[in-house]
Amino acid sequence: MKKALKILAVALLLAATVIPVQAQRRVVHYLPKYEQEPYHFGFLLAFNEMMYTVKTVENYQNKIQPANSWPVVNWPTQLFTQSETKCIYVYNIETQQTPGFTVGIIGSKRLGRYFDLRFIPSLSFSERRLDYTLMLEGNNGATYMHKFTKSIGTTFVEFPLNIKYRSKRYNNIGAYVFGGVNPKLDLASQKDNKENINGQEFINNLVTKRFDFAAELGVGFDFYNQWFKMGIEVKMSYGLLDIVKDEAFIYTAPIEKLRNKLFQVSFLFE
């Protein structure tokens, strides 16, 4: 999110320098009838930060994970082997923010003097990460804390539909807020999560459900020039569905609900 905020800060700084300059001289009003046109089209380029919102099972740290749910590859310690392991606990689970990017096509319909309906089919690329800490206890009484990260690659096909409310235009600048919904499909969510070891299949990754439905809110600024309008906006997107697939596995056992969350800085050209 820090990188996205830096990009936003630079964009707002540029906007802050443009406004005083326009106020000090006679301004040519570009695209004066732009808002009166019924339809507008364009494209979007964006930087995003994807993450999860994790709701854990109550007292999950005290629950022993069954042996058939243990990871069987890259056994983390030489203090004792898997067969010498007495039990494993999931000690902690946290989510990481990861950067990505989005491209999309903009379709906008005028609903009224200050209202627009926008449809922006998009492709978003990133990954989500979960940090796990396992506590292993051997039959000999030794314990070992193992930390590792599970990365889930993500390619979202998104269909955001939102209502945009515009302020009154000031010279060649306008502000707006928007809100709406975003059905999305994760093309990478069904990636194979099994590994074959000595003829047996073992689960070795976290897999999420393919479909999600999100609510979105955001704010932005429109900048008009001679040939087109450029917008800079930020939005938060909150997944409404639980996307975890419970496969009786140590990576999913402590998770009661898992939801998508996204922060995005967008540049729109119409």
Predicted regions: what they are:
Residues A23-P99, E270:
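Short glycine/proline- and aromatic-enriched beta-strand/turn motifs that initiate or cap beta-hairpins
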Residues R210-A215, F221-E270:
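Predominantly the C-terminal beta-signal and adjacent terminal strand-loop region
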Residues E37-F41, Q97-F101, G153-V157, I173, ...:
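Residues that define the transmembrane beta-barrel architecture of outer-membrane proteins
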Residues V54-Y60, L130-L136, A188-I197, I243-I250:
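Outer-membrane beta-barrel translocator domains and adjoining extracellular loop/strand segments
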Residues N48-Y52, S124-R128, N182-A188, S237-I243, ...:
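Structural signature of outer-membrane beta-barrel domains
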Residues F43-F47, F101-K109, P121-L123, V157-Y165, ...:
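Residues on the lipid-exposed face of transmembrane beta-strands in outer-membrane beta-barrel proteins
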Residues V28-Y30, I88-I93, T143-K150, E201-V207, ...:
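Extracellular loop and loop/strand-boundary signature of outer-membrane beta-barrel proteins
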Residues Q36, G112-Y114, K168-N172, Y224-Q226, ...:
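Outer-membrane beta-barrel channels and translocator barrels
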